[in-house]
Amino acid sequence: MSGHSKWHNIQKTKGAQDAKRAAAFTKIAKELIVAVKEGGGITDPANNSRLATVITKAKAANMPNDNIKRCLEKAAGAGGGDNYETITYEGYGPGGVAVIVETMTDNRNRTAGSMRHHFDKFGGNLGASGCVSWSFDKKGVLVIDNEDGDYDEEEVMMDAMDAGADDFEAEDDVFTIYTLPDDFNDVVANLSKYTFASAQIEMVPQNYQKLDNEDQIKLMEKLIDVMEDDDDVQNVWHNWDQD
């Protein structure tokens, strides 16, 4: 399994990512609200597994507990907040890079138009459902940043396997723990002594694709940026090998 290069890229552009923190919290807030609504209004993560998963993601992103609490109160209140639905789009970026875009929207026509526009503008094309998702695996992904050397690699690996992880990977100072989606919350609970730099369910590529053409690389970077900046977009998964 290829290294979790996205984490390295995030670190390289930390200043830019810090500027997007508020936007990231807004997206997570939307996920919290949807998790409560789709969980029958249950705000206790012990009885709402999807909510537990999103709360883990929120805490890894350093979202303040007060923010999380307000989102849960809003979701449980009268009307339950905005009426969002989750829609996933699939397509191809420049050079045939496979792209999956997860959205939460209150207007599917607006979002569908935006997705088609983004793909077309930056050298890609929007495809049919299932056109690329077959080449990805849905996994829980827990990332530990060990830049300070606080953790021993072998100990983390053994703890991860004992906790029920599906796979473990070490690259430079980053440890990545993979789980089956249904095991995610249990593995997180069993690894509570560790601090995660990120923690969520992801679509992990089965293989990666390089772009050697500089124009295609620039277009792919722009496509990812514009997708991630779209208010309706929650996650962008792709198989571009950026190393």
List the model feature ranges, each with a label.
Residues 1-127, 132-141:
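N-terminal cationic and glycine-rich segments that engage phosphates or anionic surfaces
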Residues 141-243:
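Positively charged, low-complexity, intrinsically disordered RNA-binding extensions
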